[in-house]
Regions:
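Catalytic/RNA-binding core of pseudouridine synthases
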Residues: 1-139
Length: 139
């Protein structure tokens, strides 16, 4: 199979414990290191579908990157860590949980468009480096 023979999309079910870029590199190896790119970045602690385009289809990535996305998540209440995720050191545990009404009223604030400020331990690039890499150096 030649590189220019490969064009199209796959939706990889990325497991927990691997970065989106590492997943892409593994898939590229299967397809003879052909040109490929993905839409969005899933945190290494996240699992989910990672859309990967190959060959000429990489030109269509821009159309998918602006589309609506849906996230399903699980919350562990009461644990505060140094990084805001499961990789950080647990700083404190609080055994007080929000009521179901409080949760319902809060999630209604997330319907519609809003600007989300990226967490300092996110994959967002800051001066060419991932924010979480810079933040971990300061710990």
């Amino acid at each position: 199979m030649k590189e220019n023979d490969i064009s199209g999309w796959i939706f990889l079910d990325k497991p927990i414990g691997i970065s989106s870029n590492r997943a892409l590199q593994k898939v590229r190896k299967i397809f003879n290191n052909c040109k490929a790119g993905y839409v969005g970045t899933l945190d290494p602690l996240a699992s989910g579908f990672l859309p990967i385009a190959f060959g000429k289809s990489t030109k269509t990535i821009k159309y998918l990157s602006d589309s609506c996305k849906e996230y399903v998540f699980e919350i562990t209440w009461g644990i505060h860590s140094s990084t805001g995720d499961l990789e950080g050191e647990v700083m404190k545990i609080i055994k007080k949980y929000p009521s179901l009404d409080k949760i319902r009223n809060t999630y209604l604030n997330f319907i519609g468009d809003y600007y989300q400020v990226p967490h300092k331990f996110s994959s967002k690039k800051v001066d060419g480096k991932k924010a979480y890499e810079l933040a971990r150096k300061k710990l």
